[in-house]
């Protein structure tokens, strides 16, 4: 398969090197377009008010891989690859392997998930891979699973356009509890901002915060609760696969809102 790989940790991150090299090793045609520096938590931002530069990078990846380092965001990287750098469209867009999990509502901030989301915006099935640790450099389990999942999709293509958000526990292979199909959970934080004072007496804020245990979800969910959330399944050391889509319409509430009789609203 022809595969485009990106990330938000940057061109020098071990996660993307492990993923790209692992896929090339089993015969896939791999292209890498990723940020030239750390771009974590940039969400789906695009660069609009300055030029985007992309340079071919050698010696970082397997010789079979063509790679570019891009000055833009993760979403920029995928968009630039699809419309300017690659001669033909890839079969899959992959993002990762991220250094740290992307679970629950944190996915809205994730540059990794957003890079993969840009793939399905352009009608290409996508996968985001994340390792459940910010410090671990053991990517072998994650790479092995990525190889297996890509092989599965190659032999049995997804029946609908979707993004698979995959999180792998940062534990030994023997400690993995299994693989679960999950729904998106909820992550909440306390003490989100630290208020500090600089040497000149000016107040500034540093985004910090402590993750709470998974909190209660919004009621009246359309998704069956027989599926574990990604947050709880990862806590139990399962590899999680959560299908995502870019359409955020709350479908079940369309009929309810129609009862508002909005024709009677004033707008002048």
UniProtKB/Swiss-Prot annotation:
A divalent metal cation binds at residues 8-9, 40, 98. SUPFAM superfamilies: SurE-like (SSF64167). It catalyses: a ribonucleoside 5'-phosphate + H2O = a ribonucleoside + phosphate. Gene3D superfamilies: Survival protein SurE-like phosphatase/nucleotidase. It is found in: Cytoplasm. One of its GO terms (molecular function) is 3'-nucleotidase activity. Its EC number is 3.1.3.5. Keywords: Cytoplasm, Hydrolase, Metal-binding, Nucleotide-binding. Binds 1 divalent metal cation per subunit. GO terms for cellular component: cytoplasm. Its cofactor is a divalent metal cation. Coiled coil: none annotated. Belongs to the SurE nucleotidase family. Nucleotidase that shows phosphatase activity on nucleoside 5'-monophosphates. PANTHER family: 5'-NUCLEOTIDASE SURE, 5'_3'-NUCLEOTIDASE SURE. This is 5'-nucleotidase SurE.
């Amino acid at each position: 398969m022809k595969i485009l790989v990106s990330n938000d940790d940057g061109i020098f991150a071990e996660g993307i090197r492990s993923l790209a090299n692992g896929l090339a090793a089993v015969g896939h045609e791999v292209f890498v377009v990723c940020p030239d520096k750390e771009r974590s938590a940039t969400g789906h931002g695009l660069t609009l008010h300055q030029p985007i530069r992309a340079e071919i990078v050698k010696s970082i990846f397997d010789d079979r891989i063509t790679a570019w380092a891009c000055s833009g965001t993760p979403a920029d990287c995928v968009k630039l690859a699809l419309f300017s750098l690659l001669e033909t469209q890839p079969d899959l867009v992959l993002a990762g392997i991220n250094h740290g999990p992307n679970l629950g509502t944190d996915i809205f901030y994730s540059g990794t998930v957003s890079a993969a989301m840009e793939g399905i915006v352009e009608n290409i099935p996508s996968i985001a891979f994340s390792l459940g640790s910010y410090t671990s450099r053991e990517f072998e389990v994650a790479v092995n699973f990525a190889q297996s999942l890509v092989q599965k999709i190659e032999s049995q293509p997804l029946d609908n356009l979707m993004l698979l958000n995959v999180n792998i526990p940062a534990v030994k292979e023997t400690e993995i509890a299994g693989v679960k199909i999950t729904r998106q959970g909820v992550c909440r934080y306390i003490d989100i901002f630290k208020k500090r004072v600089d040497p000149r007496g000016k107040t500034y804020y540093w985004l910090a915060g402590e993750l709470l245990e998974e909190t209660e979800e919004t009621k009246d969910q359309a998704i069956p609760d027989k599926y574990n959330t990604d947050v709880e399944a990862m806590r139990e050391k399962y590899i999680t696969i959560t299908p995502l889509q870019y359409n955020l319409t709350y479908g079940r509430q369309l009929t309810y809102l129609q009862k508002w009789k909005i024709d009677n609203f004033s707008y002048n």
